[in-house]
Amino acid sequence: MRLEYLIRDINEEMYRKVSESRHDLSEEEARKIAKIIGLSAIKYGDLSNQASKDYIFDIDRFTSFEGDTGPYILYTIVRIKSILAKYQEQGKSLENLCLEEAQGASEKDLMRQLCSFNAMMDSACEETAPHKICAYIYDLANAFNKFYHETKILAEEDQKKQAGWIALLKLTKEVLETCIDVLGFSAPDRM
């Protein structure tokens, strides 16, 4: 299959998925978002495999919003952006936030994942191994999503604890965005 046909097919598949899940988007906005997600599906799908190994490009698997895929990573980033925006809508600032000592297991796991960023980037660059970046951001996205599902971030009444969690989310978003930038794609503001 020619690359131009693959891109076209992926973009159409992503447009179909975005249109089905987001009826509030105009066709133009849905196509724009689908194009961003489609690019992530192609690049992440390709780069997540070791360069020395063959693989089958499975459109259904690579365009899924679940599992080790570009769309899943983007969905995680968009979820974090949404939480940060809602925090700001409450009249709170994202500036001068400090991480707090981790309390729960999922919070500790997320912090541990973030701490391994520099070592992972050094290794990926030294070995010219973008699949290591993909593996890292998948693990980081999983760690964030577990933390998110176990924690009522915006409903937390302890302001210091909530601000610490928001600082953790902000850092997670920055690391994920740095990684996808290195891989050559970006995240939309909403999906």
Protein language model features and the residues they cover:
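Non-catalytic interaction-recognition regions
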Residues: M1-M191
